[in-house]
Design a protein with these regions (language model features):
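Aromatic "clamp/platform" in nucleotide-sugar-dependent glycosyltransferases that forms part
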Residues: 60
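Short alpha-helical segment that forms part of, or immediately flanks, the ligand-binding pocket
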Residues: 46, 65-73, 85-87
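Nucleotide-activated donor-binding/catalytic signature segment of Leloir-type glycosyltransferases, i.e.
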Residues: 24-40
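Conserved acidic donor-binding segment of nucleotide-sugar-dependent glycosyltransferases
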Residues: 38, 93-102, 108-115
């Protein structure tokens, strides 16, 4: 996440970036970056998705990232990086960027300029419903807390 934050701070998109998840030693002084921390409540997590336009998954490695399905279920496009492009698996609304400012800016602008069309296309995805998403998140939280 820190590599992405460094890159984001150099981008001139007039955008805000929010971080959700466990992370120690996060010291963010940029007013355009907000840190939520770990969010256990499924409804709060859904609200966070709904309050944002794009999800960015800055991971270098991933197995089956729930954040992608959660974002797509809320019809929020996702930007991932080349390292993990194998996770796309025919899903609409996932965009691959190189890990550089120009590529990321280009993808972000494309998504924002075509947002409604992208969201419409994302309806073709077979994804969890809101109810099943809440259940999946709740089950994960229960498992991690036991």
């Amino acid at each position: 996440i820190f590599d992405f934050i460094k890159m984001f701070e150099k981008i001139e998109l007039g955008a805000e970036f929010s971080i959700v998840g466990n992370s120690e030693n996060v010291n963010i002084s940029n007013k355009n970056i907000k840190f939520f921390g770990y969010v256990a409540d499924p409804k709060s997590l859904i609200n966070i998705y709904d309050e944002h336009n794009i999800t960015v998954l800055p991971s270098y490695t991933e197995a089956t990232p729930y954040v992608v399905d959660e974002s797509l279920a809320r019809r929020r496009p996702v930007i991932i990086f080349e390292d993990i492009e194998y996770i796309i698996r025919n899903k609409k609304g996932i965009f691959v960027s190189k890990r550089d400012i120009n590529s990321f800016t280009e993808k972000t602008k494309y998504i924002m300029e075509n947002y409604k069309e992208i969201q419409k296309n994302m309806e073709k995805n077979v994804l969890p419903t809101k109810k099943s998403m809440i259940k999946q998140i709740s089950d994960i939280i229960k498992t991690e807390n036991s």
